[in-house]
Amino acid sequence: MTRRELRTRSPNPQRMTAPPPRDAFRPKEWEIIQKYRTPRQVQQFLRSLPYNWEKDGETLRTFRGVIENWSVHCLEAALAAAAILEQHGYPPLLLDFESQDKLDHVLFLFRQHGRWGTVARSRDAGLHGRKPMFSTLRKLVMSYVDP
């Protein structure tokens, strides 16, 4: 996707592929998908889950793994948000950036009313999601520089 396409696309662009069908999800997963329909609701849901400190070794859980284990770290949260919100018309866009100390942070990226926002989970509350108030991706990313 080009920068121009990202700037001009609506929050529900025509999809190149359809989201997974309902029967791809287990009943508990589908219940969560139906309960949390907006980025704000998904952000609240992810904040309610314990942080996955990976005490037994590194993990990379899918949405299913997050629901089974009921904990989440930043990448897992972004994947879970994408799985949930794709069912409600949001493209599954992830944004990954790396700090100077080589720590990555991954967020689910969305647009509402022409403004960019994120859904995110972190050990640091300053790195959680952002409301859709940023006119450009650069402004959104810069909001994470010194939270």
Q: Where do the language-model regions lie?
A:
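A structural boundary/capping signal
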Residues: 2-147
